Amino acid sequence: MIEPLLCGIVLGLIPVTLLGLFVDAWNQYRRDTVLGDW
């Protein structure tokens, strides 16, 4: 039996972690693209 609090923390961290990784990768891609254009 998983505690509701622990379950809520896990379900809350997963989207935040994925969003953080996506934003970091997008920023790196954008930075590389800008440097390539110049």
From Swiss-Prot:
Q: Does the keyword Transit peptide apply?
A: no
Its GO CC terms are: cytochrome b6f complex; plasma membrane-derived thylakoid membrane
Q: Which GO terms describe its molecular function?
A: electron transporter, transferring electrons within cytochrome b6/f complex of photosystem II activity
Q: Name one GO biological process term.
A: cytochrome complex assembly
Question: Which locations, inside or outside the cell, does it occupy?
Answer: Cellular thylakoid membrane
UniProt keyword annotations, A-Z = Electron transport, Membrane, Photosynthesis, Thylakoid, Transmembrane, Transmembrane helix, Transport
What SUPFAM superfamilies does this protein map onto?
PetG subunit of the cytochrome b6f complex
How does the record classify its membrane topology? Single-pass membrane protein
What residue ranges are annotated as transmembrane?
Answer: 5-25
Mainly localized where? membrane
Q: Which residues form the signal peptide?
A: none
Q: Which domain of life is it from?
A: Bacteria
Function summary: Component of the cytochrome b6-f complex, which mediates electron transfer between photosystem II (PSII) and photosystem I (PSI), cyclic electron flow around PSI, and state transitions. PetG is required for either the stability or assembly of the cytochrome b6-f complex.
Question: What family does this chain come from, according to its entry?
Answer: Belongs to the PetG family.
Complex and partners: The 4 large subunits of the cytochrome b6-f complex are cytochrome b6, subunit IV (17 kDa polypeptide, PetD), cytochrome f and the Rieske protein, while the 4 small subunits are PetG, PetL, PetM and PetN. The complex functions as a dimer.
Q: What is this protein called?
A: Cytochrome b6-f complex subunit 5
